[in-house]
A protein has these predicted regions:
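Hydrophobic membrane-insertion alpha-helices, especially the h-region
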Residues: 12-13
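Lipid interaction determinants
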Residues: 21-92, 101-305
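C-terminal motif of bacterial Sec signal peptides marking the signal peptidase cleavage site
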Residues: 16-19
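Positively charged n-region of N-terminal signal peptides that target proteins for export
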Residues: 1-6
Length: 305
């Protein structure tokens, strides 16, 4: 009889102790996760590392995500990043945590639940529990975020964020056919199509006649983080090669390889992707919700001599 009582006491005590341990771990983990994800101002969505066949729409649009006091923010544009919403972007929903679970409620895309795996001090993987997809996020503070990295790692998207690029300066070099190109356009319909125009400078962007069409390629350069090689392949068979650098968030420099001419292009009509109605941008803008990021694999080549 004593043995039975003792066994029951041990069993009950073990269950009670186990329950307490599990409950404490969940509470501690939940608090830690909430504290951890809000300890970084920005989480850069390293979309090129995404794995799986599923998709979370708001993460496919965002360059950065932020979690602050239950509100979720996103930067869906490269242009004006660091300015909109004091660097956090726009409010896009809310979130909560428990254990290792992150629950998000996006204003447009609805409810998603993620399991969060910490990979390093400032890097996490979030796994969608309802579909086969994982996203990789890297944490930064706004005052230490590498905006140059953002521009150059996502240069194709930056080129798409204006309805057109107007040539505003030309210096040096030998005369060449590209001197006649006054406007360029890179569409968000895919990541390879461009258009060009000989229309006079100052033409309203909605009335530009796009004379030529083709495909473009961006290549990484070994040892150069702030330089890309841009190739324009015209459908008529012509090819133009450039050294591409970003001057600021609305200006690019194209150095023509064969003629050594340097062209400056400025963006016209900034396209806001899923922005709030009231934003801090001073750029003339149109709004669009049609763009999602895709995984871009670039060739890396030696620097030209």
């Amino acid at each position: 009889m004593k043995r039975i009582k003792l066994l029951l006491i041990l069993l009950i005590g073990g269950v009670t102790l186990t329950s307490c341990v599990v409950r404490n771990e969940i509470v501690d983990d939940g608090f830690s996760l909430n504290e951890y994800i809000s300890s970084y101002d920005l989480w850069y969505v390293d979309y090129h590392r995404t794995t799986g066949s599923g998709e979370v729409p708001f993460l496919s649009r965002a360059f950065t995500i932020s979690f602050l006091n239950g509100t979720m923010y996103a930067n869906n544009n490269i242009v004006d990043i660091g300015k909109t919403g004091n660097g956090l972007g726009i409010a896009v929903g809310n979130y909560s945590t428990y254990g290792t679970i992150l629950e998000t409620r996006h204003d447009i895309d609805g409810y998603f639940e993620f399991d969060v795996v910490q990979l390093s001090n400032n890097e996490i993987r979030i796994d969608d529990l309802s579909q086969n997809v994982s996203y990789y996020l890297v944490g930064y503070q706004t005052d230490t975020f590498d905006y140059n990295m953002l521009f150059y790692e996502n240069i194709e998207y930056f080129l798409q964020e204006f309805k057109a690029w107007e040539r505003t300066d030309e210096t040096g070099g030998a005369p060449n056919p590209f001197d006649n190109e006054h406007y360029l356009k890179f569409t968000h319909k895919n990541d390879v199509t461009f258009y060009s125009s000989h229309d006079p400078f100052g033409t309203n962007v909605d009335y530009i006649n796009w004379d030529f069409e083709g495909s473009y390629i961006v290549r990484n350069v070994i040892g150069e983080n702030n330089l890309k090689y841009l190739t324009l392949n015209y459908d008529n068979g012509d090819t133009e090669e450039f050294d591409l650098t970003v001057i600021n968030d609305e200006t690019i420099r194209l150095k023509h390889v064969s003629s050594r001419t340097t062209y400056i292009f400025s963006g016209i009509e900034f396209i806001q992707y899923l922005k709030a109605e009231k934003t801090n941008t001073t750029k003339p803008a149109v709004r669009s919700s049609g763009r999602k990021r895709t995984k871009i694999k670039r060739e890396t080549v030696p620097k030209r001599k």
